[in-house]
Amino acid sequence: MNNLVRSNFQDHPFHLVSPSLWPLYTSISLLVLTSNAALAMHNFANGHYSVYLGLILVISSMSFWFRDVITEGSFLGDHTLAVQKGLNLGVILFIVSEALFFMAIFWAFFHSALTPTVELGGQWPPIGIEPINPFELPLLNTVILLSSGATVTYAHHSIIGRNREGALYGSVATVLLAIVFTGFQGVEYSVSSFTISDGAFGTCFYFGTGFHGLHVIIGTIFLLVALWRIFAYHLTDNHHLGFEAGILYWHFVDVVWLFLYISIYYWGS
């Protein structure tokens, strides 16, 4: 329903969402993914293949849901100014909730680090733990992630300035840097001398950096969708709400990584 037709039926600017299967489909997909991941971690038979099934379901549900939202905003005219304000507020509240989640992780880390118990050997890092050198791969990853923040900002300013080519180049550079960051994070995990089961240090380290890595992957998906929409001429200098939400989320990921690097990698080692 376009704006002209809508004006004949409703006297408010808000988007009344049609019934959709995707929230239920996404919930079931996430349940399948998390349940199968737990089974795989406990070495159940074919558990890893079940995780792949869960990933396929989650990716498909996200794709279908993104398709509908893009159609509503770009072609049906459902994203009025009032709707955009509501979506912006929703993104901000979502990021605040994510910040509180990471605050709990930092709380757990500093609780153990500032008052190490007898079980930890009365010191931090605990006896037997060889922490990762913060000036090697973690420092390189910090430079890579901060560089991605600069490139995504360049892409944002480019699209505002109607420089489509600059927006494309900036977005491509950001996605590539994000993929490199994720790959290096995997390399770091593979060469680490401790695991998530190695006491409070291992748990806090992998819980914090692992969930941050998950957020990097989610942010990369958001930016990939925005990149495709720039390529498909969906976004303009005054209509790029999804891109702005992805950029705001990406800057949040940058800030969280700085706190992780300073607290866990540098101070915690």
Curated annotation (Swiss-Prot):
It catalyses: 4 Fe(II)-[cytochrome c] + O2 + 8 H(+)(in) = 4 Fe(III)-[cytochrome c] + 2 H2O + 4 H(+)(out). Its main location: mitochondrion. Its EC number is 7.1.1.9. SUPFAM superfamilies: Cytochrome c oxidase subunit III-like. Keywords: Membrane, Mitochondrion, Mitochondrion inner membrane, Translocase, Transmembrane, Transmembrane helix. GO terms for molecular function: cytochrome-c oxidase activity. GO terms for biological process: mitochondrial electron transport, cytochrome c to oxygen. It is a multi-pass membrane protein. CDD domains: Cyt_c_Oxidase_III (cd01665). It is an enzyme of class 7 (translocase). GO terms for cellular component: mitochondrial inner membrane. It holds the Pfam family COX3. The chain crosses the membrane at residues 13-33, 46-66, 90-110, 138-160, 167-187, 207-227, 245-265. It is found in: Mitochondrion inner membrane. It comes from the Eukaryota. InterPro entries: Cyt_c/ubiquinol_Oxase_su3, Cyt_c_oxase_su3_dom, Cyt_c_oxidase-like_su3, Cyt_c_oxidase_su3-like_sf, Cyt_c_oxidase_su3_a-hlx. Belongs to the cytochrome c oxidase subunit 3 family. Component of the cytochrome c oxidase, the last enzyme in the mitochondrial electron transport chain which drives oxidative phosphorylation. The respiratory chain contains 3 multisubunit complexes succinate dehydrogenase (complex II, CII), ubiquinol-cytochrome c oxidoreductase (cytochrome b-c1 complex, complex III, CIII) and cytochrome c oxidase (complex IV, CIV), that cooperate to transfer electrons derived from NADH and succinate to molecular oxygen, creating an electrochemical gradient over the inner membrane that drives transmembrane transport and the ATP synthase. Component of the cytochrome c oxidase (complex IV, CIV), a multisubunit enzyme composed of a catalytic core of 3 subunits and several supernumerary subunits. The complex exists as a monomer or a dimer and forms supercomplexes (SCs) in the inner mitochondrial membrane with ubiquinol-cytochrome c oxidoreductase (cytochrome b-c1 complex, complex III, CIII). This is Cytochrome c oxidase subunit 3. It comes from Pyricularia grisea. The gene is COX3.
